């Protein structure tokens, strides 16, 4: 077993984040992606919800911070990742999305996005693990920097149909699932990946709901981004 293999094994057992090595990052990503969502779910602690006392959006830092320091806020980063046929605003260093088309993961619908006071709401950025849910399942114990990272992590963000994002609110898998059934396996795997990465727990009903979905796709892999 190589030194890297040993480090991977120890990190996975302890639930630690793996270091990013420029020459081996693709190998590390490959190995992590081979973790099944079922196995990852079984590793998550099961507890009741903590009190919501103290929760506010401000606890997760300024909305859509430029945490990766690429000169573009997180919202526009995700719009650029998830939309096609983009038109970007001039003199914004290819940051601000003016128009684009979303193939919505939650419904399968094609949705036109136009930047504007009201029209922007047609496409919203969903926290796959809602921040309120994260708070009551362990995020209240994270540092300010960790919560800011969670709120802006591409792993925890999808551009989606605005109405469905509002419908979901802060629901977990026990209370809300995407109407597009073919996406549900990937959706709950994404939630498991986020909770594992940030050492959050699941409630018993939440775990049961996720396990039920994954029973139809036992080979579903844990996403890494």
Segments from the language model and where they lie:
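Secretory targeting and sorting signals
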Residues: 2-26
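N-terminal module-boundary/linker segments of secreted carbohydrate-active enzymes
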Residues: 26-72, 204-206, 219-225
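A general boundary/transition motif marking the beginning of the first structured unit of a protein
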Residues: 29, 90, 179-182
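Secreted/periplasmic proteins that engage bacterial cell-wall peptidoglycan
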Residues: 51-123, 128-129
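Domain-level detector of nuclease and nuclease-like folds
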Residues: 97, 106-225
